[in-house]
Regions:
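Phosphate-binding/catalytic loop of phosphoryl-transfer enzymes
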Residues: 1-88, 184-185
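ATP-binding/phosphotransfer module of carbohydrate and carboxylate kinases, centering on a glycine-rich
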Residues: 13, 17-23, 41-43, 88-187
């Protein structure tokens, strides 16, 4: 599954496994690396963190870490909020979010409220190049109107687009896989 039409039918994991031979491979939805990096960066160990990633020209998406574990679902689809029934096509979602229009803000707020209602995370982190400080204030106001204060998570705008978190998430996952291999080797 890809936002890049040319990769939609590509079987990247199979191709990588062929090239890597017996080496372990971990491939996941990019937002899952971002949220994992943000989780580790925050020093969390048992908390729930959800990242809402809004980047121009791609579907908005979320990813969550609960108690140190990435929530990926049955086959990595967890967090793909662009597939929810928002009453508009995926192309329309991409357009309204990229434009920063009132409809785009409404879609971002609905996504945030859905995450809050389903997961009730400790923190909801916004990253990407769409949500700025002004939009973040509007999101916070809308969420505060809809959710009682005792159920509202900390809502925070990332200091950067989230790219640093992505690299940190990949690094942390690689370290864990290396440790798992060492344990497996010595057993």
């Amino acid at each position: 599954l890809s936002d890049i039409p040319e990769l939609e039918e590509a079987h990247l994991l199979d191709a990588l496994r062929t090239v890597a031979q017996q080496r372990p491979i971990y491939m996941t939805y990019d937002c899952q690396y971002r949220v994992y990096g943000a989780y580790k960066d925050a020093g969390y160990t048992s908390e729930t963190l959800t990242l809402l990633f809004c980047m121009r020209n791609v579907l908005a998406g979320t990813a969550s870490v609960i108690g140190g574990r990435i929530v990926s679902g049955k086959n990595g689809f967890a967090g793909m909020t662009g597939y929810m029934p928002w009453g508009m096509s995926q192309e329309e979602q991409i357009q309204v979010i990229a434009q920063g229009s009132p409809k785009g803000l409404e879609l971002i707020v609905k996504t945030a409220l859905s995450v809050i209602a389903v997961l009730n995370p400790d923190e909801l982190l916004f990253a990407g190049n769409v949500v700025d400080r002004e939009m973040m204030e509007a999101v916070q106001t809308a969420c505060a109107k809809a959710v009682p204060p005792e159920f509202l998570p900390k809502l925070r705008l990332a200091d950067h687009r989230g790219d640093q978190y992505s690299l940190e998430g990949m690094y942390q996952k690689a370290l864990e896989m290396k440790a798992d291999l060492a344990i497996e080797y010595w057993q």
